[in-house]
UniProtKB/Swiss-Prot annotation:
UniProt entry keywords in alphabetical sequence: Disulfide bond, Glycoprotein, Lectin, Secreted, Signal
One GO location term (cellular component): extracellular region
Glycan-bearing residues: N28, N41, N213, N279, N300
Domain C-type lectin: 28-145
Keyword Signal listed: yes
The name this protein goes by in its record: C-type lectin domain-containing protein 162
Any one GO molecular-function label of the UniProt entry: carbohydrate binding
């Protein structure tokens, strides 16, 4: 049984309020596209995009678009793939019947060439972005393209720009396989696997898990609501602890206790000395002076204690 491996690439825009299917690339508000590595012939590739993805084979309608698709294919390591152009009796046109207003055939290599069958197809090379004519019976990887949307469609998971809120489908059943959506998708997936790698914890973003089923014909079917988890390894800013300094009141309290001890010693000494010398009045005057100085210090300490600030380290 062939299992299609879905390949994941980046969003290029975070500002437009539109959504793309899960696992696709958003391109300047003009559409979304998705690569499939499993090779199909041209007819079945067209059918797969239309039936399973509700889309069409990608149409590189400009040089900019052509380079965008080529760059994504290079990143994924896909050398050649079907695009949405074909011919009937050597009239080359897009799948919707419109004429090719832009093309990038390898003219130096003699393309486009006449095909041996009545219907021919067009492939694109990621090495130079050039187009080639092929027999439609050949098997190649392919790219589906579809317009962006603002709603969900029957269990398919869309993703939005960072500033937008995601709305999840509510119906469906869970499946054994899960698909993961996060910011750095190239680090979450290898080229031939479905499932998260260990580095998903390093993205620092929400991770969206989407159940999928693999049907008997090998086509992936999306079903069930996504499971949203918060990345437990999201980077956190360390906050320094609050350090409360020793207040002036606390410092003065210890100083006051020391002074009171010294005063009691001085009073005792003065009394003993004054009695011996007969200078009782001098002792009283000195004690009054000391008491006055202590009251003034206490008043100043009270004022300073009201202006104490808690300092933070």
């Amino acid at each position: 049984m062939n299992i299609f491996t879905l390949l994941f690439i980046y969003f290029l825009s975070d500002t437009v309020a539109a959504y793309c299917y899960y696992g696709t690339e958003y391109k300047n508000a003009t559409g979304c596209f998705q690569f499939f590595r499993t090779p199909l012939n041209f007819t079945n590739a067209v059918r797969f995009c239309r039936v399973n993805m509700k889309s069409t084979l990608v149409r590189p309608t400009s040089s900019i678009r052509n380079q965008q698709i080529r760059g994504a294919a290079l990143k994924l390591g896909i050398e050649e793939y079907w695009i949405g152009a074909s011919n009937v009796d050597n009239d080359w046109e897009w799948l919707d019947g419109s004429m090719l207003t832009y093309s990038n055939f390898d003219v130096g290599g003699g393309y486009p060439k006449k095909t041996e069958s009545q219907i021919g197809a067009v492939s694109m090379s990621s090495l130079a972005g050039l187009w080639y004519t092929k027999l439609d019976a050949m098997f190649l990887p392919f790219v589906c393209e579809f317009p962006p949307s603002t709603v969900y469609d029957n269990g398919i998971l869309y993703r939005s720009p960072k500033t937008q809120s995601l709305i999840f489908p509510s119906a469906g059943t869970k499946a054994a396989l899960l698909m993961v959506d996060a910011v750095d998708q190239s680090r979450l997936y290898s080229k031939n696997e479905i499932g998260p790698l260990k580095t998903e914890a390093e993205t620092g973003e929400k991770v969206y898990l989407k159940p999928i089923n693999i049907s008997t014909n090998g086509f992936p079917e999306f079903s069930g609501p996504p499971i949203v988890i918060l990345n437990p390894y999201k980077r956190k800013i360390k906050v320094k602890p609050v350090m409360v300094s020793q207040t002036e009141t606390e410092m003065s309290r210890s100083r006051k206790e020391k002074e009171e001890t010294e005063d009691s010693i001085n009073v005792k000494s003065l009394k003993e000395g004054g009695t011996a010398r007969g200078n009782g009045s001098s002792v009283a005057e000195e004690l009054n002076s000391n008491s006055k100085e202590k009251r003034e210090r206490e008043e100043n300490e009270t004022i300073r204690s009201k202006t104490i600030q808690i300092s933070r380290g």
